Amino acid sequence: MFKQFLSKLPRKSSKSDSGELNRSSSGPVSSPVQRSGTSGGGSGPVRSNSGKRMSSAVFPASVVAGIEPLVPFKDVPSSEKLNLFVSKVSLCCVTFDFSDPGKNSIEKDVKRQTLLELLDFVASGSVKFTEPAILAMCRMCAVNLFRVFPPNYRSSSGGENDDDEPMFDPAWPHLQIVYDLLLKFITSPCLDAKVAKKYLDHAFIVRLLDLFDSEDPRERECLKTILHRVYGKFMVHRPFVRKSMSNIFYRFVFETEKHSGIAELLEIFGSIVSGFALPLKEEHKIFLWRVLIPLHKPKSVGNYFQQLSYCITQFIDKEPKLGSVVIKGLLKFWPITNSQKEVMFLGEVEEIVEAMSVMEFQKIMVPLFLRIACCVTSSHFQVSERALFLWNNDQIVNLIGHNRQAILPIMFTALEKNAQNHWNQSVLNLTLNVRKMFCEMDEALFMSCHARFKEDEAKQCSAAEKRKEVWARLENAASMKPITGKTAVLVTPRATSIAC
């Protein structure tokens, strides 16, 4: 088997091969390697001849120089090191099935040692990479890394399935070295971005982004670092990277609600947003409105909420006027039936409102505190507690104080109902503290609201008594003359202004 493994390596290139190299090096790669459903990074069986022909069409094998790949770098002169590099890289294009640890163990070890040699060589930065070397490297990474993942049948319900164990790829010992090699290669000062951009092109980047759907968290962590370096080094690709990431978010929010790497992608985008120049471009604001705010909608938002909040905070730090836009978006996607999400939303609201000016706060205070009033009276004590904790924030209390004429009438009924009826002692104590705070803030306004509350309460009691009397008369009339035949009964439901 070892002889068969070595026999796969190309020998001394012919003149026709050299001509093909010149032709292939003159233009960029048009598309990445298209792979069938084998597991990647060598985790599937050795590819068929048709698969190799397809790979050769994209990254031609003729770039391989005629030099023995198992020779150490230290044993060849400097003039031959790049040829040896290309030869070793081509050796690593052979893949194996890692689901069976005992299969092809010698060949796997040879490949692993070769990858480690390549890693040391790239890290040394001793030779400037030529176009054939870049081409061979991209081809090897495509063959080993790019693959189609099996369908993900896990639930997208987020926090409800936190006990799910992460899936680990059996090929990771090899995949990790390939990822480390790609990272060292991209960040190497010996790599000319102007030349490499022809091979690390849009198609390569799209396939790299597809790998973020891997269920192996180790792979996603490596991809996060690599994509960040690609974004930093290849400025010409930056708009395309942002657009491709947006497409992944769109597909996740509006179609599938299933993706393993949303948190990692958002983490990358957070660092991208922090580098945006001022004033913000319209396309960046559109990304906030159409992508980041709708990302609050999926059930699995808890899996990436921290990274999402960071991205939004970065936008607001860049342009504080966006705070009111974000609050309106949060109110639009407010999770009325999901208490855990409500707690998270309240935390994000606090972070945003804390940084708002009085003018921006006034734009959203009425709808915001209508929602907060509903949260305060929630029977779920964590929601009610988190809403009342807003009054522990001095900056928010200061904003409320400046606008108490509008906010206290909204909140008063919720506070009184809590003080009278809430079952949780902690919520009851917090309610009384907030109530006392409002009273000390403006006693005259507080007493006015209290009088109005008592008046409304009396009206409600009176209306309830009238309804009771009407029903009593109806029941009395019905008992004297029972309904006969097909008598239509019209019932009109009472409309409500806001759902709590």
From Swiss-Prot:
It comes from the Eukaryota. Pfam families: B56. InterPro entries: ARM-like, ARM-type_fold, PP2A_B56. GO terms for cellular component: cytoplasm; protein phosphatase type 2A complex. Residues 21-37 have a biased composition (Polar residues). One of its GO terms (molecular function) is protein phosphatase regulator activity. It is found in: Cytoplasm. SUPFAM superfamilies: ARM repeat. GO terms for biological process: signal transduction. Residues 1-53 are annotated as: Disordered. Keywords: Cytoplasm. Gene3D superfamilies: Leucine-rich Repeat Variant (1.25.10.10). Induction: Induced by epibrassinolide. PP2A consists of a common heteromeric enzyme, composed of a catalytic subunit (subunits C), a constant regulatory subunit (subunit A), and a variety of regulatory subunits such as subunits B (the R2/B/PR55/B55, R3/B''/PR72/PR130/PR59 and R5/B'/B56 families). PANTHER family: SERINE/THREONINE PROTEIN PHOSPHATASE 2A PP2A REGULATORY SUBUNIT B, SERINE_THREONINE PROTEIN PHOSPHATASE 2A 57 KDA REGULATORY SUBUNIT B' KAPPA ISOFORM. Belongs to the phosphatase 2A regulatory subunit B56 family. The B regulatory subunit may modulate substrate selectivity and catalytic activity, and may also direct the localization of the catalytic enzyme to a particular subcellular compartment. This is Serine/threonine protein phosphatase 2A 57 kDa regulatory subunit B' kappa isoform. It comes from Arabidopsis thaliana. The lineage of its organism: Eukaryota, Viridiplantae, Streptophyta, Embryophyta, Tracheophyta. The gene is B'KAPPA.
